[in-house]
Amino acid sequence: MDLRLMGFDHPLFHHIMDYAGDDKSSNSSAPSRTFMLDAKAMAATPADVKEYPNSYVFIIDMPGLKSGDIKVQVDGDNVLSISGERKREAEEKEGAKYVRMERRVGKLMRKFVLPENANKEKITAVCQDGVLTVTVENVPPPEPKKPRTIEVKIG
């Protein structure tokens, strides 16, 4: 169990967990540490999804991230992946120390399976005031074919 997921973020716990992670005899069917961290990042990243007649809009909170820190990708399986990472400021002023650390740091991630009518070539992403808006246009439905009339001849 990763104690960092439960709020124990002291360097001593990091050392203990890193040491425990070196055990090569662990159960191979257990979820990997990366999977668990990704699952936590996905659960902690709120998102709204809207369906319009011509598009789908994904609205995701990405607080504290610049547009260059956010990655939006679509893979071959129609999966839209949105990720970024917010890091703690490395610089500390002389004599200053944190009394309380409540702002979330770490990985932000969401994955969505796009519907078949999503146009993977027409995706836009705009980040403003810590909110990312990803718009995926729909492929227009095919025009219904008119029935062909066949002339009946007298034989």
UniProtKB/Swiss-Prot annotation:
Residues 38-153 form the sHSP domain. This is 17.2 kDa class II heat shock protein. Keywords: Cytoplasm, Stress response. Belongs to the small heat shock protein (HSP20) family. InterPro entries: A-crystallin/Hsp20_dom (IPR002068), HSP20-like_chaperone (IPR008978), Small_HSP (IPR031107). The gene is SHSP-1. The lineage of its organism: Eukaryota, Viridiplantae, Streptophyta, Embryophyta, Tracheophyta. It is found in: Cytoplasm. Pfam families: HSP20. Induction: By photoperiod, by light treatment of dark-grown seedlings, and by heat shock. It comes from Ipomoea nil. Transmembrane segments: none annotated. GO terms for cellular component: cytoplasm.
